[in-house]
Amino acid sequence: MSSYTILITKRFEKDLEICKKRGLKLSLLYTVIEQLKLNGTLPKQYRAHKLSGNYANYWECHIKGDWLLIWEQNDDELILILTSTGTHSDLF
């Protein structure tokens, strides 16, 4: 099975810089991204789920505690678009 292609948005790049400034352990984020890249799924510990409302086409998972990752996922074309990362208050 082929792995997913990872694309990132400008917002994700900005959010990543904020996470770096906060001293968050980015290796945790990179582990989640690598797992998603392999087959588009995550272990239950990350509580991955689809969002609703304005975010109906997006997925969210908990990297650690209140640190979230939001992405779009196209399973037909094997593409993941990393949209944003941060706390609930940062993102919603």
Residue ranges and their predicted role:
Residues 1-5, 11-27, 31, 52, ...:
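Enriched for short, Lys/Arg-rich terminal
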